[in-house]
A protein has these predicted regions:
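Glycine-rich beta-strand-turn "strand-cap" elements at beta-sheet edges
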Residues: 87-90, 165-178
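Basic, often amphipathic N-terminal segments
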Residues: 1-81, 102-161, 167, 177-189
Length: 189
């Protein structure tokens, strides 16, 4: 019998989206659940991930992450206005609201990763791929072969929205769910 030796992920860092966009994307999740039975990721608040899930070593706590972001990221005034341009997908596996990538997203991600690694060395690592910000609607349990139709339906919604990137949120695993543990707000001006 094979045992899973992957450490249980405990935290990730992201940006919560405004309530109006969150409500629209929650409607999309409900559609994916009703039409295709999708449930994966639907319990997680709508967000853009900056630092993917990682296991925080026992000698550290969420408070250490909060302090690192307050000390090393918030003073840099990295808030900005972002833009969603409809929907896209990573293959057949992940449907997302297409957040337009730019240097402001990359800088916010890089500074956040650096702060987390300074506070809790080795707990995560910077992704080597170019940063593609996105707000996941459904993932992992989308039936094979339906993504083209799903994208056609979703893109008929013409989701085109500006939104403020005005927070960094630390998500914590509670049982089998991710919850917003702490949200650190900042100005976009």
């Amino acid at each position: 019998m094979k045992h899973n030796n992957i450490p249980q992920q405990t935290h990730f860092i992201g940006v919560l989206l405004p309530e109006d966009i969150t409500c629209r994307l929650e409607d999309c999740r409900r559609y994916m659940n009703k039409a295709y039975g999708c449930k994966s990721g639907h319990g997680t608040p709508i967000h853009v991930t900056l630092v993917p899930p990682f296991k925080l070593p026992e000698e550290y706590a969420t408070a250490d992450l909060i302090l690192a972001i307050e000390k090393d990221v918030l003073p840099k005034r990295l808030g900005f206005t972002a833009y969603i341009d409809n929907f896209d997908a990573f293959g057949d596996r992940t449907l997302f609201a297409n957040v337009i990538a730019d240097d402001a997203w990359t800088k916010l991600r890089d500074e956040t990763v650096k702060a987390i690694l300074n506070a809790c060395p080795g707990c995560t690592k910077k992704d080597k791929k170019p940063f593609q910000p996105h707000a996941t609607v459904s993932n992992r349990d989308i039936p094979a072969g339906v993504m083209t139709k799903v994208l056609q339906v979703m893109n008929e919604l013409n989701l085109a929205e500006d939104f403020p990137v005005d927070n960094i949120t630390i998500f914590e695993r509670k049982g089998n769910r991710w919850e917003a543990g702490a949200t650190l707000e900042f100005s976009i001006y």
